[in-house]
């Protein structure tokens, strides 16, 4: 009986010891996991360096993604609002900069795609704005293109608002001056073919302003007219692939026309017509730089004529054209 009692005491003691051991081990493992998690979180918060996720490159400093322009080591890099490393041409703080397609490093004191980047890593694009027509109309005729025997009028008086009676040359100048101000704020150098309506300029004269400036983009501002009051919307005009005067510029002219038209329509909400490829425009044929002519709307449409005189809508017109120019310059 005594042996049986001792047996039960030993058995109970073993169970108690096993329970205590199990509790200690589980508590120990839990503590170890918590320590590991805390250590991992602490390491992430302190992490500094590059990471690649989903094919996109990021840089972390003390566990946080960098955004904006930063110097890392010997080079400058730029990251968008989500922390993604940027490449190619970008406007950063109203300055155009180029970041290597593979490395993301900002280029300085180099020429990329014919564009000169200064020692501060800045390229200043040149845009020539040509507000169509004038109060003083250039008289006579001029060749359609270099070496052409076909002659066209040097200029015309343009159209007039059917509802507002505002002349085309006034609206194009108004938009041109507003556009100049916006582009200058965004880091562009802007040259105007005219800043008032008291000068007579032929289409060749206007193109030569762009040629002399070696413009990165030549924007000809016009407004359309039609026999029908129902026609409305915007279009752009560029030379054709087989233009005998500026064949080498076709791709750039087309890309500029697409970018400007798409952005203009997106900002204004107007109807998108089309890109008219034509070799009948003297100003386009004589240009030696990327060129587009935008018809911003129809002054023969009472609704569109009135709308284009509203300051709020003019702001959209200006922002749309500016966005198109920038898209062309950064994408092409």
What are these regions (language model features)?
Residues 124-125, 183-191, 213-218, 270-271, ...:
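Loop/turn elements at helix/coil->beta-strand transitions in domains of secreted/extracellular proteins
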Residues 1-6:
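N-terminal secretory signal peptides that target proteins for export/translocation
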Residues 7-125:
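Extracellular adhesion/carbohydrate-binding repeat motifs centered on closely spaced tryptophans
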């Amino acid at each position: 009986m005594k042996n049986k009692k001792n047996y039960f005491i030993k058995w109970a003691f073993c169970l108690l010891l096993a329970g205590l051991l199990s509790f200690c081990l589980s508590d120990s493992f839990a503590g170890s996991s918590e320590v590991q998690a805390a250590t991992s979180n602490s390491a992430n918060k302190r992490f500094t360096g590059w990471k690649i996720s989903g094919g996109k490159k990021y840089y972390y400093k003390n566990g946080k993604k960098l955004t904006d322009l930063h110097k890392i080591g010997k080079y400058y890099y730029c990251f968008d609002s989500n922390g993604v490393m940027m490449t190619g041409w970008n406007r950063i703080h109203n300055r155009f900069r180029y970041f290597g397609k593979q490395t993301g490093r900002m280029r300085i004191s180099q020429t990329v795609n014919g564009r000169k980047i200064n020692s501060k890593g800045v390229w200043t694009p040149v845009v020539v704005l040509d507000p169509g027509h004038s109060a003083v109309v250039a008289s006579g005729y001029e060749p359609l293109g270099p070496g052409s025997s076909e002659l066209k009028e040097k200029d015309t008086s343009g159209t007039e608002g059917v509802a507002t009676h505002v002349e085309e040359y006034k609206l194009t100048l108004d938009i041109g001056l507003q556009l100049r101000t916006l582009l200058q704020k965004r880091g562009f150098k802007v040259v105007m073919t005219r800043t008032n309506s008291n000068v007579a300029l032929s289409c060749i004269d206007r193109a030569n302003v762009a040629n002399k400036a070696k413009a990165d983009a030549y924007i000809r501002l016009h407004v359309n007219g039609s026999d029908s009051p129902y026609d409305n919307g915007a279009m752009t005009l560029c030379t054709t692939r087989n233009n005998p005067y500026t064949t080498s510029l076709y791709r750039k002219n087309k890309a500029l026309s697409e970018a400007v038209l798409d952005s203009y329509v997106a900002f204004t909400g107007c109807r998108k017509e089309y890109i008219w490829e034509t070799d009948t425009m003297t100003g386009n044929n004589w240009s030696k730089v990327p060129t587009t002519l935008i018809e911003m709307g129809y002054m023969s449409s009472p609704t569109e004529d009135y709308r284009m005189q509203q300051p709020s809508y003019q702001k959209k017109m200006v922002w749309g054209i500016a966005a198109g120019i920038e898209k062309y310059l950064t994408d092409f």
